[in-house]
A protein has these predicted regions:
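Bacterial signal peptide processing site
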Residues: 23-25
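Surface-exposed binding/hinge segments that line
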Residues: 118, 134-194, 220
Length: 231
């Protein structure tokens, strides 16, 4: 999968997508620029917070987060959901437990694989009250959520309703039946996170390591950055 570059103009309060054309060349490109690349201004609002999926609930940050991070399911222009990172999302008879299998081969932009634990740790981090994430309540239906709202937490406690079976499989136990849970996991708060996130969440939010179709390419103060396309 090729990743296009997403560039953020920090001082100009704008977000630009660096879209690389497939094939051909740009005859007007300046010396040293990447051929076949263009800068298109897409979202003229600045993120209010660092770009962490579970702590983003506004348009300025939500748009780039949607481009940077792929979730278990995605939605087409008509709002129809289909599996993206997920291979399958299978409920038990009363939809109180789901077995989720993810596709192998997905990687973050730092080269590390997207695994089942990439989801379970990320979801638990967002749910944990110690971490004060804006989207915490989205995980209230998962067993163990109430335990992560108590005082005295360290921040690394995990949701008891999430169990890793193997690198590509995990289960989700819910507090009650929820037949639309497979749709909810398409929201950006349910994105996976790499291990590097937990070392310094604040620094991560300024330069996210993501798994979506775009990667972050910060613009310089004058000339900007060159569009990059990763294999």
């Amino acid at each position: 999968m090729k990743k296009k570059a997403l560039a953020f103009a920090a001082m100009a309060c704008s977000v630009a997508m660096l879209l690389s054309a497939c094939g051909g060349s740009n005859s007007n490109a300046a010396s040293g620029d990447t051929a076949g690349s263009n800068i298109i201004t897409a979202y003229n609002s600045e993120p209010q917070n660092p770009l962490i999926p579970g702590n983003t609930n506004e348009t300025g940050g939500g748009k780039p987060v949607d481009l940077l991070f792929s979730r278990l399911v995605s939605f087409d222009k008509d709002g129809k959901a289909s599996n993206e990172v997920a291979e399958s999302i299978t409920p038990n008879d009363d939809a109180t437990q789901y077995t989720i299998k993810i596709k192998s081969g997905w990687k973050f932009t730092d080269g590390t694989p997207v695994t089942a634990e990439s989801f379970t740790k990320a979801w638990s981090y967002v749910a944990n009250a110690k971490n004060a994430q804006k989207c915490s309540s989205f995980f209230s239906a998962i067993a163990g959520y109430d335990d992560l709202q108590k005082d005295g937490l360290k921040g690394d406690e995990q949701l008891s309703g999430l169990k890793v079976v193997d690198d590509t499989t995990f289960t989700v136990d819910l507090n009650q039946s929820d037949s639309v849970f497979p749709i909810k996991v398409g929201y950006s708060a349910f994105a996976p996170l790499p291990e590097s996130f937990y070392k310094d969440p604040k620094a991560f939010g300024e330069k996210p390591v993501s798994n979506g179709p775009y990667k972050l390419a910060p613009l310089g103060s004058q000339q900007g950055s060159r569009p990059r396309q990763e294999p």
